[in-house]
């Protein structure tokens, strides 16, 4: 399928505006639920839709923390803000990190991830090998005394598919997969720790993987709602409660047990060390590369 460049660029423009807005509302001790709801509302106000639930991951949690509908957690520490915007399934994915405890190490980690991202963006072109990008990322991060997260990667994106099949590693993994024309997210993670993540607690973030019919009418109705509202893009239990009610959580559990949904885990740095993240989306064309989320 041919990329709808107009929608890709518009999604990126909205993401950029929301990123500027998000930086103004994220403060220490603000409820994460409030931050997520405000970011998602701003996306909708500007004419887009959230491509996935806002991730607000603190310290050693590298990714996949989104507030539940009754979440009480407050913003603190080294906070990663990762959100996406889509227009008819064409996505802009971006992230930034904030130091909410005035820590020199946090600031260095944030600067390191941003520098690694910028150096990666500088070399991206049509037909570049993804592992070459990963090599630049790891060299940059390691030169500042930190480690890249080796089992988290950037990714290609397709319409209604956040992960489109091609990965962009954060190290030189030796796999010479080249970037063709398309949409990609590049996202370095830096840590003073071991440089790997493990599965943590269930995140409340889901993705539709099968349309086989469940038993109960409640679950069947919820399955149709998910297909219509989210297609193959990730969603969360909080959205389901907001759109329907808390009874729908029973249907969600049934769909998970029936194999209709993949339930993502939070991703936690193995040694318990803090993690920073930076991310932008790029559109690779024959003669140019556009960072859509700037």
Predicted regions and their residues:
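Active-site neighborhoods and metal-handling regions in enzymes and metal-associated proteins
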Residues: 1-294
């Amino acid at each position: 399928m041919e990329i709808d460049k107009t929608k890709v660029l518009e999604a990126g423009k909205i993401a950029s505006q929301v990123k500027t807005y998000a930086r103004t509302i994220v403060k220490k001790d603000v409820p994460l639920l409030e931050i997520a709801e405000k970011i998602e509302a701003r996306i909708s106000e500007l004419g887009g839709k959230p491509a996935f639930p806002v991730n607000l991951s603190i310290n050693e949690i590298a990714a996949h923390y989104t507030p539940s509908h009754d979440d009480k957690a407050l913003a603190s520490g080294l906070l990663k803000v990762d959100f996406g915007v889509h227009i008819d399934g064409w996505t802009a994915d971006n992230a930034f990190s904030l130091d909410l405890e005035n820590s020199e190490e946090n600031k260095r980690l944030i600067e390191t991830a941003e520098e690694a991202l910028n150096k990666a963006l500088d070399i991206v072109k049509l037909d570049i090998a993804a592992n070459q990008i990963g090599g630049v990322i790891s060299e940059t991060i390691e030169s500042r005394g930190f480690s890249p997260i080796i089992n988290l990667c950037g990714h290609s994106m397709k319409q209604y598919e956040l992960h489109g099949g091609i990965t962009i590693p954060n190290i030189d993994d030796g796999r010479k997969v080249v970037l063709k024309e398309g949409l990609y997210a590049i996202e370095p993670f830096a840590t003073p720790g071991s440089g790997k993540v493990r599965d943590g607690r269930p995140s409340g973030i889901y993705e539709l993987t099968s349309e086989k019919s469940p038993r109960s009418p409640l679950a069947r109705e919820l399955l149709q709602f998910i297909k219509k509202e989210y297609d193959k893009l990730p969603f969360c239990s909080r959205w389901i409660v907001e759109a329907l009610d808390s009874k729908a959580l029973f249907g969600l559990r049934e769909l998970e047990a029936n194999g209709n949904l993949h339930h993502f885990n939070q991703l936690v740095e193995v040694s318990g060390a803090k993690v920073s993240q930076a991310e932008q989306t790029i559109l690779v064309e024959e003669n140019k590369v556009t960072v859509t989320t700037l």
